[in-house]
Amino acid sequence: MVCGSRGGMLLLPAGLLALAALCLLRVPGARAAACEPVRIPLCKSLPWNMTKMPNHLHHSTQANAILAIEQFEGLLGTHCSPDLLFFLCAMYAPICTIDFQHEPIKPCKSVCERARQGCEPILIKYRHSWPESLACEELPVYDRGVCISPEAIVTADGADFPMDSSNGNCRGASSERCKCKPVRATQKTYFRNNYNYVIRAKVKEIKTKCHDVTAVVEVKEILKASLVNIPRETVNLYTSSGCLCPPLNVNEEYLIMGYEDEERSRLLLVEGSIAEKWKDRLGKKVKRWDMKLRHLGLNTSDSSHSDSTQSQKPGRNSNSRQARN
């Protein structure tokens, strides 16, 4: 038996359909060599190791696919989206299973949309656009058809994919590839980025899994919160990436500004987030910035309400004059 996944992976596509341990079995009538080992270097860190050609972009061989996917190395280096590598590999080296040998499984539309949302602004900045060949519109929606997404992959025993320096499966998640673009905590940045949460926290642990890093922090103070509840205790900050950006050091105390995943009630520490060594002065600044931001929001709301009221007044005055006449 030749498995098309790493570590007994299970794929959970639309509805309640669960494909049992994605393995290529030798069955009567099955075409020989329908699945082949993934040989695309960028995709060897992902949790499947069997693919099928031609892929979704009509490359007949992996050699052709390697040449084509290499154009995205620069974009991947910006860490513009934690979903970009998964999406690209699902297109260029689609997962192959015994159940779906006749047609490679496509990535879900939502995965494409998240990757595009994060990375298209960078492409536009350099006068490029999101490739038509990677259009999201034609991809299947999770609850209406079979598709693959990071959330739909679990191990057979429920464990994550451990990162092991001696394990070639995790190449590409190496920290030496990580280049974090520093983001300074300024009022302009705070207003522009509209962070969901701001906390004072001490870093307790950095957990490194294959293609995923999580920071475990002890929350000391909550300066701003949104929809996800933040307890005054140890919480996880999820990167959904093999890189920890911004970088954190264990036992250091930071002011952290980031975003949230409302659907899964997670706090995110992703590209564009801020982590600066805690200083009381900085904490006071952030509180002032937040008050200004709230005040600006209230003024905008009051102004639009006032404009609406003013637009109604002439009508009422006109009616009253007509009544007097």
Swiss-Prot record:
One cellular-component annotation, GO: cytoplasm
Major place of residence: secreted
Gene name of the record: FRZB
Signal peptide: 1-32
Disulphide bridges: C35-C96, C43-C89, C80-C119, C108-C147, C112-C136
Domain notes: The FZ domain is involved in binding with Wnt ligands.
Function: Soluble frizzled-related proteins (sFRPS) function as modulators of Wnt signaling through direct interaction with Wnts. They have a role in regulating cell growth and differentiation in specific cell types. SFRP3/FRZB appears to be involved in limb skeletogenesis. Antagonist of Wnt8 signaling. Regulates chondrocyte maturation and long bone development.
Family the UniProt entry places it in: Belongs to the secreted frizzled-related protein (sFRP) family.
Organism: Bos taurus (Bovine)
GO MF annotations, alphabetized: Wnt-protein binding
Biased composition (Low complexity): 300-312
Intracellular or extracellular location(s): Secreted
Name of the molecule in the record: Secreted frizzled-related protein 3
Keywords attached to this entry: Developmental protein, Differentiation, Disulfide bond, Glycoprotein, Secreted, Signal, Wnt signaling pathway
Residue span(s) of domain FZ: 33-150
PROSITE patterns in the record: FZ, NTR
Quaternary structure (record): Interacts with MYOC.
Chain positions covered by the region annotation Disordered: 299-325
NTR domain segment(s): 178-298
Superkingdom of this protein's organism: Eukaryota
Pfam families xrefs: Fz, NTR
InterPro entries, alphabetized: Frizzled/SFRP, Frizzled_dom, Frizzled_dom_sf, Netrin_domain, Netrin_module_non-TIMP, NTR_Sfrp3, SFRP3_CRD, TIMP-like_OB-fold
Composition skew (Polar residues), residue ranges: 313-325
Glycosylation sites: N49, N299
